[in-house]
């Protein structure tokens, strides 16, 4: 199935809509969604770009999703649920931690899928784990992906790597030319914070200015409210180094492509791991050579010496040498610029980013993750085979998992209707401890649907602790309030086990048409059977019947009187059945 065949209503939620890499990528995606016939809804705390959305057909709601106050979060969850219902949202897509908490809980309560995009590195705080709540988690670089895997245990099968993309139509490429001029313009673009390395960049300019006294430097971006003092410190450093005639603090600037058109070189001086570095690919697209520090996701973007120059962080001298090398060497500059443009066209273009994001959206809504719980005896699991078959027929593209007891594992191991078997061994450890260990494992799968065919307290509790938005089962009073889709026992009468299961599947729109039971023995099973028959001098053609005496100590209905077994064996013997 292609993404063009599905019309989706997508809600993206992020803290604010000011000028920055996250905001730019989010808005670019929303604009393309609208252009392709989808509905794009955005929720944020407002910002300088908020009022530009309407002209692109993007719906925006302002909520305090940037605030960490518990009262604010609860309020935003309530309001977001209303927005999800009103706009008929198919997917909620969060791009930061507090929005992930709000979006994750709201989508869970609304029974719709939730995904996240990790745009940076997160401290190992409990709230940071909200970024792993998505059915799929998009990471913007290999570096961020490794961080989410190592620090938060995010399973690889739920991770999707999608490079950020630049709009090649917006950033016009300038063919490199031989430069015979005295004034060169160097730019540094980004928020003014200590981690961005402005201090080391400014120190490198002192050395550059001794060789090129007429350089012009544009520091684009502003300091957040809690870093205003740091910005003043940088201005003081510029004055002390007598670079005030060279360096201009431009402030926040919305049209980055206009800034790029003025630059001869872009510098990224980050001292901490950079998640990606959108400004690098914007320079690539514009024909502006780049010198950057070799940290984090920058290594995923720049191939040193081919499409950019990498230098160690916090090393002003090496940075100055790299700046001078690029500006004074036309051959090197030409080569860097041309290769960088190819990199942007092939790897970091907006069209590819949008297409791959839409594929994740499509997979999110079309490939359901379904868990069936049947942790009882072997016979009961065999009787669930018609339910497995019916689910596969109803959801051919779904990933269907089954939770069974240890002894029942082999019964469904080769079942073609099931993608994965998960074992719940109640005897392995203490019951309560084991229960919550299994629950933690199950929650990592991010199931869309849980179907509880076991129908007891443990299975109801496991259903709830999976954190699946939709949970189906019987309303039997045994913790069944933990299920949000229930069938009542009253009025069902005496029915066989398969019909019993069909009542639960029925509220999911699944009809069991084939009640037949089937097993899938392996080659090793047949080999074992042949060996056993040979030892007993029994041919394969000989009809055999196995009888399980006293199959259940718990259920009196499964225990025949002795005379019934005598009658049965006599009848079988008359037909030469052993």
Where are these regions (language model features)?
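A conserved, positively charged/aromatic
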Residues: 108-142, 146, 152-154, 482-489
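Active-site donor-binding acidic/aromatic loop of nucleotide-activated sugar
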Residues: 226-231, 244-253, 259, 309-310
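Conserved acidic donor-binding segment of nucleotide-sugar-dependent glycosyltransferases
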Residues: 304-305, 309-316, 325-331
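A short, well-ordered alpha-helix in the C-terminal region of glycosyltransferases
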Residues: 318, 325, 332-346, 356
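Conserved donor-binding/catalytic core segment of Leloir-type glycosyltransferases
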Residues: 11, 179-196, 202-205, 218, ...
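Catalytic machinery of carbohydrate-active enzymes
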Residues: 184, 365-578
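Short hydrophobic beta-strand element within catalytic cores of glycosyltransferases
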Residues: 42, 289-292, 302
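A conserved mid-protein helix/loop that constitutes part of the nucleotide-sugar donor-binding site
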Residues: 23-28, 193-210, 217, 229-232, ...
């Amino acid at each position: 199935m292609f993404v063009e065949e599905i019309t989706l209503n997508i809600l993206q939620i992020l803290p604010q809509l000011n000028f920055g890499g996250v905001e730019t990528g989010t808005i670019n995606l929303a604009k393309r969604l609208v252009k392709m016939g989808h509905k794009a809804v955005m929720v944020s705390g407002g910002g300088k770009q908020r009022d530009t959305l309407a002209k692109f057909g993007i719906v925006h709601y302002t909520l305090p999703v940037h605030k960490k106050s518990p009262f604010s979060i609860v309020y935003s969850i309530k309001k977001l649920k209303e927005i999800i219902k009103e706009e008929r949202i198919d997917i909620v897509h969060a791009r930061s931690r507090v929005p992930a908490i709000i979006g994750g809980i709201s989508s869970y309560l609304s029974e719709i899928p939730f995904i996240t995009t990790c745009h940076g590195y997160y401290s190992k705080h409990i709230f940071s784990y909200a970024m792993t709540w998505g059915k799929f988690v998009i990471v913007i670089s290999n570096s961020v992906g490794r961080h989410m895997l190592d620090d938060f245990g995010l399973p690889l099968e739920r991770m999707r790597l999608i490079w950020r993309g630049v709009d090649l139509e917006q950033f016009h490429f300038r063919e490199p030319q031989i430069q015979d001029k005295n004034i060169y313009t160097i730019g540094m673009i980004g928020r003014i914070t200590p981690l961005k390395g402005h201090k080391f960049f400014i120190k490198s300019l002192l050395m550059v200015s001794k060789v090129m006294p007429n350089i012009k430097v544009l520091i684009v971006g502003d300091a957040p409210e809690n870093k205003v003092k740091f910005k003043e410190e940088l201005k003081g450093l510029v004055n002390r180094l007598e670079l005030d005639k060279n360096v201009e603090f431009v402030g926040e600037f919305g049209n980055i492509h206009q800034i790029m058109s003025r630059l001869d070189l872009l510098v990224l001086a980050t001292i901490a791991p950079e998640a990606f570095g959108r400004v690098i690919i914007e320079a690539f697209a514009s024909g502006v050579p780049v010198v950057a520090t070799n940290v984090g996701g920058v290594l995923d973007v720049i191939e040193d010496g081919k499409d950019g120059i990498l230098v160690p962080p916090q090393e002003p001298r090496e940075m100055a040498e790299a700046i001078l090398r690029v500006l004074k060497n036309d051959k090197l500059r030409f080569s860097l610029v041309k290769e960088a443009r190819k990199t942007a066209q092939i790897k970091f273009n907006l069209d590819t980013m949008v297409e791959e994001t839409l594929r994740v959206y499509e997979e999110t809504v079309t490939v359901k993750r379904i868990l069936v719980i049947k942790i009882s005896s072997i016979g009961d699991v065999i009787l669930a085979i018609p339910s497995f078959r019916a689910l596969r027929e109803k959801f051919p593209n779904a990933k269907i998992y089954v939770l069974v007891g240890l002894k029942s594992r082999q019964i469904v191991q080769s079942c073609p209707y099931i993608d994965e078997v998960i074992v719940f061994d109640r005897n392995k450890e203490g019951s309560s401890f084991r229960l919550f260990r299994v629950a933690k494992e199950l929650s990592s799968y991010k199931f869309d649907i849980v179907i509880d065919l076991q129908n007891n307290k443990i299975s109801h509790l496991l259903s709830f602790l999976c954190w699946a938005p939709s949970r189906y089962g019987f309303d039997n009073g045994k913790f069944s309030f933990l299920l949000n889709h229930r069938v009542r026992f009253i009025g069902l009468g005496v029915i066989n086990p398969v019909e019993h299961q069909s009542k639960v599947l029925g509220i999911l729109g699944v009809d069991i048409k084939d009640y037949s039971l089937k097993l899938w023995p392996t080659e090793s099973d047949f080999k074992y059977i042949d060996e056993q028959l040979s030892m007993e001098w029994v041919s394969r053609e000989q009809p055999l019947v196995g009888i399980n005496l006293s199959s259940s100590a718990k259920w009196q209905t499964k225990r025949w009187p002795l005379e019934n077994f005598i009658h049965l064996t006599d009848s079988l013997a008359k037909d030469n059945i052993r």
